[in-house]
Amino acid sequence: MNNVQLNSDAYFHSASVNEMYTVIRRAADCSVKLSNNNQVPTADAGLDYTIPKGTAFVLTGVGTDPDNDPLTYLWEQLDNTSNTQPPVATATSGPVYRSITPSVLPTRYFPGLSSVFANNLVPKWEVTPGVARNLNFSLLVNDDKVTGNQAARDQTLITVSNAGPFKVTSQTTNIEYDGSVPLAITWDVAGTDVAPLNTQNVQVLLTRDGGVTFEVLAESIPNTGSANVDLPNENIATARIMIKAVDNIYFAVNSYNFKVKQGVLATVEGKLKGISIYPNPANNEVNIILNKAEDAKYMIYDLSGRLVNSGNLAADGKINVERLSTGNYVLSIQLKNGDKVNEKLMINK
């Protein structure tokens, strides 16, 4: 026998609660009924979903209570034991996710976010399936009233497909990014954009506290495998990117913490009055006109922060950009006195 842990936890599995209800209802005719004036809450486990294999996901339920009692939420896999334990990613049946203590939050990540952020999708008792299979989950909503609690239960079916794994392929090292420069992100679509998943759009999120909180960088962008998103232009010591399917429950996180350094765009842009850049979009040449004749340097960065062109600004203010490919760039102009301004530059060939 393989014990998940050496001690028990002080709660009942939803399957045990269901068995209790069955017995109580069966004995209802010969029992004495006493009201505890506690109304039954409601539980909604949400829709059934199809997700890619080898990919983390999150379940969020909804519970309401007519008495406005505080609720706890218990997400559990319901598949009967028919596989090797501890579970393995290749199991096509049986449980792969352990039961954990009920939470006041209606959300549970599979596996837990601490494992996801450690780049481990197969911890011993929360193993992400690497093969196509079905996963049955139960949501038990409990009002935990000490004078006689009430609970409600709902179920959802998660179908793991042969598509996947869906994963973030950028930000794979602990480096620092300029917050004033759009961040280039990439991910492996892995067949999630076609049937049976048909995920056409994804959401991009940023966390700076290891998944405790998230902020939206892009609400809905095409699921094409690459995009440029704007970062908060401030200093961030430990940032991670999450890319999550729109209208689905699966997601992926980049593999390493990275830093964000506040860039100059937001803080000194107003120092250079009268600057003019044209044409923008440009083809082979860009013209820079300053408010006064002054020595200046220019730097052009691509959206990954790589310097692709630089030099001293000529007297006529012309910059040759014929070697740059079509796309978006950041043009940085720095005067001799240290003042600096960044502007978005578009190249259209």
Q: What is each model feature region?
A:
Residues 1-138, 147-152:
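Extracellular (secreted or membrane-anchored) zinc-dependent metallopeptidases
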Residues 30-37, 257-278, 284:
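Residue-level detector of functionally pivotal "anchor" positions at catalytic/ligand-binding pockets or at interdomain
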Residues 45, 49-57, 174-181, 277-282:
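Short, solvent-exposed loop/linker segments at the N-terminal edge
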Residues 51, 62-67, 143, 188-195, ...:
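Extracellular acidic, Ser/Thr/Pro-rich low-complexity tracts
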Residues 53-63, 182-186, 285-289:
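A short beta-strand segment in extracellular, disulfide-stabilized domains
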Residues 142-149, 246-250:
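Short, solvent-exposed loop/turn segments at the edges of extracellular beta-sandwich modules
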Residues 205-209:
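Conserved Ser/Thr-centered positions that define the repeating blades of beta-propeller domains
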Residues 268-278, 282-349:
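C-terminal outer-membrane/trafficking sorting elements
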